[in-house]
Design a protein with these regions (language model features):
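N-terminal, post-signal-peptide region of Sec/Tat-exported proteins
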Residues: 43-51
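Surface-exposed loop-to-helix/strand elements on domain peripheries
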Residues: 318-339
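Structured, hydrophobic secondary-structure cores that serve as assembly/anchoring elements
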Residues: 320, 324, 636-668
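Bacterial flagellar/type III secretion structural subunits and associated motility module proteins
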Residues: 1-43, 56, 64-202, 207-311, ...
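Long, contiguous alpha-helical "rod/stalk" segments
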Residues: 51-58
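Alpha-helical transmembrane segments of integral membrane proteins
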Residues: 50, 303, 333, 615, ...
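N-terminal alpha-helical signal peptides/signal-anchor transmembrane segments
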Residues: 48-49, 62, 66
Length: 670
């Protein structure tokens, strides 16, 4: 009987080592899923942040376009056009009335020029160097000049602007030094030196800085006799004219619609209310000056407003769109902040303006909303509105005001002022501070006898010394006192001035040039006080305007009256005259552009909806980044754990493989 036997082969354990890096990498890839999800969230936030940036840019662009419509002056601007711009040009304020004017320019205004006798040197000393005072007075010369010298009977009437002085001494008593001292003093005289080519070639030329007949010079010199003989100039004295007049001071002479007009300057702002005319040359041919509303600029600004609004509206629509066919939503679709902005803008545009005159909606000037949320301009309706209601169009856009009384003017408003029309009642008009004499002034002033007066303006004191003379009239004496008082260093340094004249009773009267209780004129003595003002002069401080606006108390400062409570709070008006009692109404409108601009400013502010939304997104992005960092930190530990575990397993399997090989070898020997 035969028998057979077989030997079993042991299974191979861990025939090869594990690929630990690959295993760990695959495991870690799975662990990355939460990070990938958070990175997708970050991408979404960043996309929204970019979208909000585009919205902010569109809002800023729209606000920039609004600026030209928030200013009433730009919306109510006028143009002034001359038929011959080589003869004259002009500018018109918003207050100018449209119209056409015929102007003929006879001669231009010019400054007086005086020329001194020639000197042989620019730098040689003139005179002894003793301290010398040049005193300049400006006024009107009445008389005839022959060869630059005025004859007998010539008069000089001071303009009352004050005596201006220049000091010459041993440091500057050359011709060049005198020139530089006069220019440095800034007294309204320009000094220059001309070389005429003669044996005494250097001649000092003095030119009044201002044009006009009333800016002729009278120069007195005290001190060095040589300088006095060179520069003293009294046009009323045939022996006192040491300078020669080469150009006489002249007013500009023109005719406006046939009416003769004489003005001191070639820039004239008081012949046509609200219009400044600049004369360039004489012309016997009439020039037509046309003042008209600047409708072209307003039309351009309105179209810019609509274009910028449409760009913003399109941006908002794009960011919040939903495509039903593809079932995809824009990045900010459903965002509450953007939805609120769209709603707020529509609300502003669809609210009627208050206090805007005859117009209260954009539709009345041809601006209408379209189905897609944009605006469209009907150019025909806009042109008609500008033609028929130019001033009221401004009230539709800007913060504007107007008064029904011609002597009451809208001034300004505050953020507290509500749109509306408010009644005005005046209980007291503003007055000037004044000092009025009780008797006619004596016209003869004698040095050391009656030539000084001590005065105070708004509490600032000045002692005046009146030049001794027998004055031609009480008005001439008043002009001299006005000139001295305004020329006082203390008074001019305080930035105040006065006007002096003769009242209906023939008495001297001095008044401040500003209205209100802060202004006064006082007389504090002097040897000439009683002779000029009498024994009982009357000093009266100015008063402030008083009254109500919309029935509420208002605060008056000078001629300015400001409402202090109610809907009109902060509304300020200028009452320039008239009577006490009811003075009509004042209207205020804040307009669409003004309201829109305030809204956009708040929207873009640090606490506004757009800033808050972007801040929230940035915070969310930061929070997600922290979450990712935390997870990544955990994954580092987990990766180390996986590596350790599988490395240990791999080592164990390697050991088992070695044992298996040994056993296999031993079994094969049986």
């Amino acid at each position: 009987m035969s028998s057979s036997s077989s030997v079993s082969t042991a299974p191979t354990i861990g025939a090869s080592a594990l690929n630990v890096p690959m295993l760990v990498s695959q495991l870690m890839a799975t662990e990355q899923y939460p990070i990938t999800a958070l990175q997708n969230v970050t991408t979404s936030y960043q996309a929204k942040l970019t979208a909000f940036g585009q919205v902010q840019s569109a809002v800023s662009t729209f606000q920039s376009a609004l600026q030209s419509l928030t200013s009433a002056s730009s919306l109510q601007a006028n143009t002034a056009t001359a038929s011959d711009p080589t003869v004259l040009s002009a500018t018109a304020l918003t207050s100018a009335a449209p119209g056409s004017y015929s102007l003929t320019v006879g001669n231009l205004a010019q400054s007086q020029s005086l020329v001194a006798s020639g000197q042989t040197s620019l730098t040689n000393a003139i005179g002894t160097g003793a301290t010398t005072t040049l005193s300049f007075d400006f006024g009107t010369i009445t008389g005839t000049a022959t060869g630059g010298i005025y004859g007998t009977g010539t008069t000089f009437t001071s303009a009352g602007g004050g005596i201006k002085t220049v000091t010459i001494n041993s440091s500057n008593n050359s011709l060049q030094g005198i020139r530089d001292a006069i220019n440095a003093a800034n007294i309204g005289v320009s000094a220059s030196i001309i070389n005429d080519g003669s044996s005494t070639p250097y001649r000092l030329v003095l030119t009044s800085a201002n044009t006009g007949a009333a800016n002729s010079m009278k120069i007195s010199v005290s001190g060095d006799a040589t300088i006095s003989s060179l520069l003293s100039y009294d046009p009323t004295s045939t022996t006192g004219q040491n300078l020669n007049q080469t150009i006489a001071a002249l007013n500009a002479n023109l005719a406006v619609n046939g009416l003769a007009v004489s003005k001191a300057s070639n820039t004239i702002s008081d012949i046509i209310p609200g219009v400044t005319v600049n004369l360039s040359k004489p012309s016997a041919t009439p020039v037509t000056l046309t003042v008209a509303p600047d409708t072209a600029t307003v039309t351009k600004n309105v179209n810019s407003f609509v274009t910028a609004y449409n760009a913003l509206s399109t941006t908002l629509a794009k960011m919040t769109a939903y495509n039903p066919s593809t079932q995809t939503a824009a990045i900010l679709q459903g965002n509450l902040a953007i939805l609120n902005i769209k709603s707020d803008l529509n609300g502003i545009l669809n609210t009627q303006a208050q206090g805007a005159g005859s117009l209260n909606s954009l539709a009345q000037i041809g601006i209408n909303s379209q189905p897609d949320g944009t605006l469209a301009v009907n150019s025909g309706l806009l042109a008609t509105a500008l033609q028929n209601n130019f001033k009221d169009v401004a009230g539709l856009f800007a913060a504007t005001g107007s008064a029904s009384d011609s002597l009451v003017a809208y001034n300004t408003y505050t953020s507290s002022t509500q749109p509306g029309t408010y009644p005005v009642n005046i209980t007291q008009l503003a007055t000037l501070g004044s000092l009025t004499g009780s008797a006619a002034p004596g016209l003869t002033i004698t040095a050391g006898v009656n030539d000084t007066i001590n005065m105070a303006v708004n509490g600032t004191s000045a002692t005046l010394t009146i030049p001794p003379a027998t004055y031609s009239s009480a008005q001439a004496l008043a002009s001299e006192i006005q000139s001295l008082l305004n020329g006082s260093s203390a008074i001019s340094a305080a930035g105040i001035s006065v006007s002096a004249g003769i009242n209906a009773s023939g008495n001297l009267s001095i008044s401040t040039n500003n209205y209100g209780s802060a202004y006064s004129v006082g007389l504090n003595g002097g040897n000439g006080a009683s002779g000029l003002f009498g024994s009982a002069p009357v000093a009266a401080a100015g008063t402030d305007v008083q009254g109500t606006i919309n029935g509420a108390n208002a605060t008056g400062v000078g001629q300015m009256l400001t409402s202090s409570s109610g809907n009109s709070q902060g509304l300020s008006i200028l009452v320039s005259g008239g009577i006490t009692g009811a003075r009509g109404t004042v209207s205020y409108s804040n307009g669409y552009a003004y309201t829109m601009n305030n809204y956009l400013t708040s929207l873009l502010s640090s606490s506004g909806a757009l800033t808050s939304s972007t801040n929230e997104l940035n915070t969310n992005i930061s929070d997600v980044a922290k979450q990712i960092a935390s997870i990544q930190q955990g994954l580092i530990a987990k990766q180390a754990m996986y590596t350790a575990e599988y490395t240990a397993l791999n080592n164990m399997m390697t050991t088992m493989t070695s044992t298996s090989a040994f056993l296999t070898q031993q079994l094969s020997k049986l």
